[in-house]
């Protein structure tokens, strides 16, 4: 108790000294700016602002809540959210006023986010207990309690799946590919000799290309200038022959799919796909069938069952993409589905979902095509490929018994590294 009082005294003293150099109106502007960042889900921008505000106001539990929320949405930093959310959850204001500078309490959401943080940290008993606590406190007409019940189910699924792990052999692609920043969204040709991925650089994200030579990956080349693009494009998929690259771009208020073609050793400028694929809604990922006649992609357009769904489109007589069709309720759920990929024989669909038999967040699933040409019930590919956090972008090779994936690891070269399974 004495230690806590001493800490509070030091923080209060820091506030007193700091306030002399920063006016209350400036702090209010900082708060408004941070709240705007949260609105647009720009947690990296919001975090230092809330940390600064917390130095000035160490007894404002709204700032503990916001800092915890930011860490929970920052890859590689999620474990830091727990202590802040625990503090916030002990100081709930039932009349919480979001966006108000004078608000000093935390909302009930702090409990929900704390439960998520426990789940991601594999503290599953604590997660279940905290989800239950949240359910007892909130009005079911205001909060989606069905989602909370589903989250509780995922915790029980996780406990079961972690007792029965699948056998995997995982290999980091090494420092020729992975560096101190993040490498993610790997896409690879069927012969596993052409690899493209997105790399986080100091000031922007860039598309890189590497070829396998003499059993080793050659030094990756930054393709961003050659593709005629800026930092808003991300690798989405690569055809088996390695000659057609699909990319995803955030275009102001929506996401769209683009393509580039390889001729010789030169990639073409990117071209936006037609209006049957790209709409005013959010298109986030796409992949092509082996013959290039079908495209599977994700969108939250009005025909979706819920959130992002997987759609398919076939080429018409002109060679362009025809109307898109929802894959239906066997694949799509009331929650999100994303990052679909096909095995090299087009018989197995791999994708990530928040709404099937999950162990937490997005999990990777596989669905096999039956004799009638219909996709079968999705099967979770298991732990430890799937975890209690979000798992996306599993790129299968061969018949899907092997694949590539990016993830954070304490023994990696940087943030996210690319692994082969």
Where are these regions (language model features)?
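Alpha-helical segment of the N-proximal tetratricopeptide repeat
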Residues: 25-56
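Short, conserved micro-motifs composed of acidic
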Residues: 28, 99, 103-106, 113, ...
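Structural motif corresponding to the intra-repeat A-B loop/turn of tetratricopeptide repeats
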Residues: 40, 74-75, 121
């Amino acid at each position: 108790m004495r230690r806590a009082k001493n800490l509070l005294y030091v923080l209060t003293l820091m506030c007193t000294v700091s306030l002399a150099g920063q006016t209350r109106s400036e702090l209010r502007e900082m708060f408004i700016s941070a709240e705007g960042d949260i609105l647009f889900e720009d947690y990296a921008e919001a975090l230092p602002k809330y940390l600064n505000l917390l130095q000035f106001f160490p007894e404002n539990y709204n700032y503990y809540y916001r800092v915890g929320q930011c860490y929970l949405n920052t890859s590689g930093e999620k474990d830091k959210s727990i202590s802040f959310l625990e503090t916030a959850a002990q100081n709930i204001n039932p009349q919480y006023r979001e966006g108000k500078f004078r608000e000093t309490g935390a909302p009930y959401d702090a409990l929900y986010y704390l439960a998520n943080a426990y789940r991601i940290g594999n503290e599953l008993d604590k997660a279940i207990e905290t989800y239950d606590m949240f359910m007892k406190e909130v009005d079911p007409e205001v909060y989606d309690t069905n989602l909370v019940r589903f989250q509780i189910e995922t915790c029980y699924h996780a406990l079961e799946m972690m007792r029965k792990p699948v056998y995997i052999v995982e290999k980091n692609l090494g420092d020729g590919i992975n560096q101190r920043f993040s490498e993610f969204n790997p896409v690879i040709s069927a012969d596993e000799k052409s690899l493209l991925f997105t790399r986080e650089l100091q000031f922007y994200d860039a598309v890189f290309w590497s070829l396998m030579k003499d059993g080793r990956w050659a030094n990756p080349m930054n393709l961003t200038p050659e593709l005629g693009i800026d930092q808003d494009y991300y690798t989405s998929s690569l055809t088996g022959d390695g000659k057609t690259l699909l990319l995803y771009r955030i275009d102001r208020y929506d996401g769209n799919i683009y393509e580039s073609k390889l001729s010789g050793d030169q990639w073409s400028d990117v071209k936006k796909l037609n209006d049957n694929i790209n709409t005013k809604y959010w298109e986030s990922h796409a992949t092509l069938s082996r013959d290039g006649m079908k495209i599977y992609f994700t969108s939250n357009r009005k025909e979706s069952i819920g959130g992002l769904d997987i759609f398919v489109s076939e080429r018409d007589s002109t060679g362009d993409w025809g109307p898109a069709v929802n894959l239906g309720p066997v694949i799509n759920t009331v929650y999100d589905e994303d990052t679909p990929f096909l095995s090299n024989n087009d018989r197995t669909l791999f994708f990530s979902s928040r709404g099937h038999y999950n162990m937490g967040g997005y999990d990777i699933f596989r669905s096999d095509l039956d004799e009638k040409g219909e996709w079968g019930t999705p099967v979770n590919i298991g732990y430890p490929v799937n975890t209690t956090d979000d798992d996306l972008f599993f790129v299968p090779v061969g018949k899907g018994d092997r694949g590539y994936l990016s993830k954070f690891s304490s023994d990696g070269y940087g943030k996210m590294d690319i692994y082969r399974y």
